Amino acid sequence: MSLPLTRKDLMIVNMGPQHPSMHGVLRLIVTLDGEDVIDCEPILGYLHRGMEKIAENRTIIQYLPYVTRWDYLATMFTEAITVNAPEFLENIQIPQRASYIRVIMLELSRIASHLLWLGPFMADLGAQTPFFYIFRERELIYDLFEAATGMRMMHNYFRIGGVAADLPYGWIDKCLDFCDYFLRGISEYQQLIKQNPIFLERVEGVGFISGEEAVNWGLSGPMLRASGIQWDLRKVDLYESYNQFDWKVQWQKEGDSLARYLVRISEMRESIKIIQQAIEKIPGGPYENLEVRRFKKAKNSEWNDFEYKFLGKKPSPNFELSKQELYVRVEAPKGELGIYLVGDDSLFPWRWKIRPPGFINLQILPQLVKKMKLADIMTILGSIDIIMGEVDR
């Protein structure tokens, strides 16, 4: 009896950059043997906008509106790292009230980011119902952002030395109401998702990363903590006022896609706990340190008529960055978001290097999808949680 011939020819498939499950303009060149993945090559750069070079030709205040376009689902964190870099470089003190407001906004933004990860992730796996529930809760967070900052997404709220405006009257009560409501919502998500056998079949044991691999690849955030590494910059670096609150680092030891899901769900609960404590302990006082505003020195104090027409009477609140260098980081929803800043005794940074967590975490994707099925690519890529605006910069 003749045996059937085995297929030796491989198929090369382009996934993206327009595929809806690519979470942006990501392109994957996938080599397949039937349904089995032999190789996967991510192609990046479709959303590159030169964010680092733009920063080196702007003052920090002028650059703030740009940074919300990195990770446009967690804009508070990109603003926070942008103002933290010059604050640490020049040793600028932050009023206690401003620090508490920052913590509240950062944790609300973390919840919103995790929600917008969870909805499309479940949709990629074939579950449409959680997608609509999650957008309902996310709109409540955006209502809080709009009331405090005037914008629902691109907030432009953080300032060097504090925040742009104080919390409006009645905002704290609305935030507490949301916290109570959302805690019940998380329990609903768990009942709806965690007990679903189809969901468990798709994520359990898929995309395994050991703790040693996670460290060697430089992973951070839920990708690192889901592999058994208890590393959270809010505990390690003690920035803002996180050391004044009682909360725990959420982690899992399994290292698969299910563990990454559980870490993010648990982080949303911890964020609610931090917000409630911050609202309870929030002090009075100023919301911005106005003394940090060092106005640009005019080289020639006697302006002629032509220059006066084009220069406003009140210059923008710029200040010089001294000739130093430092690296500053925050714990963003997707991992460690860092800035390497080099000052040069001028208003513009000499070097502004962005360390995006999504770009680093994405590098392990080819290793995770090899020897897996084609359908598992969506599960693994979704569990990494990337935003291409941040990856390409």
UniProtKB/Swiss-Prot annotation:
InterPro entries: NADH_Q_OxRdtase_suD (IPR001135), NADH_UbQ_OxRdtase_49kDa_CS (IPR014029), NDH1_su_D/H (IPR022885), NiFe-Hase_large (IPR029014)
A GO cellular component annotation in the UniProt record: chloroplast thylakoid membrane
Localization: Plastid, Chloroplast thylakoid membrane
Main localization category: plastid
Membrane topology: Peripheral membrane protein
Record field: catalytic activity: a plastoquinone + NADH + (n+1) H(+)(in) = a plastoquinol + NAD(+) + n H(+)(out); a plastoquinone + NADPH + (n+1) H(+)(in) = a plastoquinol + NADP(+) + n H(+)(out)
SUPFAM superfamilies: HydB/Nqo4-like
Gene Ontology biological-process entries: photosynthesis, light reaction
Keyword annotations: Chloroplast, Membrane, NAD, NADP, Plastid, Plastoquinone, Quinone, Thylakoid, Translocase, Transport
GO molecular function: NAD binding; oxidoreductase activity, acting on NAD(P)H, quinone or similar compound as acceptor; quinone binding
EC number(s) reported in the record: 7.1.1.-
Family as reported in the entry's similarity comment: Belongs to the complex I 49 kDa subunit family.
HAMAP family: NDH1_NuoD
Subunit structure: NDH is composed of at least 16 different subunits, 5 of which are encoded in the nucleus.
Function: NDH shuttles electrons from NAD(P)H:plastoquinone, via FMN and iron-sulfur (Fe-S) centers, to quinones in the photosynthetic chain and possibly in a chloroplast respiratory chain. The immediate electron acceptor for the enzyme in this species is believed to be plastoquinone. Couples the redox reaction to proton translocation, and thus conserves the redox energy in a proton gradient.
Name of this protein: NAD(P)H-quinone oxidoreductase subunit H, chloroplastic
Species: Festuca arundinacea (Tall fescue)
